[in-house]
């Protein structure tokens, strides 16, 4: 993986503020050539350092229920369960953690009934799950992709 210098970090910061910013505007603000910006962005894209994605607001597309679900698995079944969880459209994030749960997932649903069905039907059918701990978001204070 290439090492990022101050210019690379400044480019990333500019894109995080406005991913549609023109290369010429970024170049002017950083006092470098537009070619430098184009080259650096292409290099970082090819290295997988970042990607351009569409970020949607779940609530504005009808996904009003967000749940963070802790999952405990049978010994030796963590990866098997994680791979199955990845296949569900509602599941946005799957990660293995230390602490009280083997896996944590973030999932979005249109209604509470959809969440209940996911737990009682979909998760209940998965081999290797011992128990789940469901936490429903009541209020969101921050959701950012910037680092």
Question: For each predicted feature, which ranges?
Answer:
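A compositional/biophysical signature of low hydrophobicity enriched in polar/charged and small residues
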Residues: 1-147
